[in-house]
A protein has these predicted regions:
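Short amphipathic
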Residues: 3-10
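Amphipathic alpha-helical segments
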Residues: 11-31
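Short, mixed charged/polar active-site loops
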Residues: 3, 60, 99-101
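Short amphipathic alpha-helical signal-transduction/dimerization elements
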Residues: 138-149
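Short beta-edge strand/loop motif at the mouth of beta-sheet-based domains
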Residues: 5, 25-62, 73, 152
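A short, structured loop/turn motif at beta-sheet edges
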Residues: 11-15, 66-73, 105-115, 143
């Protein structure tokens, strides 16, 4: 497993950035760079609860939230994959990376801007996908957050 981190400074309030990260109408905009299929997030937003990152065919990832401090930080721990709506959290391949964290932190800087810091643990074979996804995705979050007309 490899730990990757990504950062971007955004001139917007933390809550606005948080909402852009996780609101259904904006989540698909910044995550479009990770795969060809649009991905949605379905979560009960509870520590120990269930979170799905899936496409329209119900294929994707299943995770749980291990830390939630809105609008400052959330940590997802990936548990397995979802294929055709069925969870796989038991296979040997899954057990190699099950529990891998994905953390989003919003840090207020001295000048009033906010640093969005993402840290994710992945299998090295997915590094290129993550680099492309987060590099482009964080730019999209910044653009949306710094637009005046986006509701807070």
């Amino acid at each position: 497993m490899e730990t990757l981190s990504y950062n971007i400074v955004i001139r917007a309030p933390k809550q606005k950035i948080w909402d852009i990260l996780w609101a259904p109408e904006t989540y698909t905009k910044w995550t479009q760079y990770f795969s060809e299929e649009p991905t949605i997030i379905k979560s009960d937003w509870k520590v120990g609860g269930r979170t799905l990152f899936v496409d329209h065919n119900n294929n994707g990832m299943v995770a749980t939230i291990s830390n939630l401090d809105e609008p400052n930080e959330v940590t997802f721990n990936h548990l397995g994959i979802v294929e055709n709506g069925e969870d796989d959290i038991e296979s040997e391949k899954i057990k190699q990376w099950s529990g891998a964290p994905e953390r989003y932190s919003l840090i207020l800087l001295d000048d009033g801007s906010v640093k969005l810091h993402v840290e994710i643990q992945i299998d090295p074979e997915y590094r290129e996908v993550m680099d492309r996804g987060f590099t482009n995705g964080l730019q999209t979050i910044k653009k949306l957050a710094e637009e005046k007309e986006f509701p807070v």
